[in-house]
């Protein structure tokens, strides 16, 4: 799979640990094949509908729609959060950057989409899950990522579009 890092993430992150937390989460979506599982699930329902009404083009239409609007279920998001945190710990990287980034997102999300509409678990709940996992799986060997080049990298980012 491919993971694209946008400059917006680099601008919003306060330190490399936050970027590592986001990337660990996204890598888990790829490793767990969440996109494929979501497409197969949707295709299965589309095939059932198509066979029921006798219109196989419904299957093709549903697959095309799903490819354009992929999203992960709340369960898949929680799995990516949990496995991403464990991957950071296996790499001996402190996972608290993941927690800080979720807390930052929660501060921004409070006035946006109601939780019952979103496919993602509410950010505050995700932050609490990460906090609980960190407490349940201590990693004394884990260290923060070095940040000596962090500010220079952020300063080198292209200007934001107006």
Question: Residue ranges of each PLM-predicted region?
Answer:
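A Zn2+-metalloprotease active-site environment signal
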Residues: 1-162
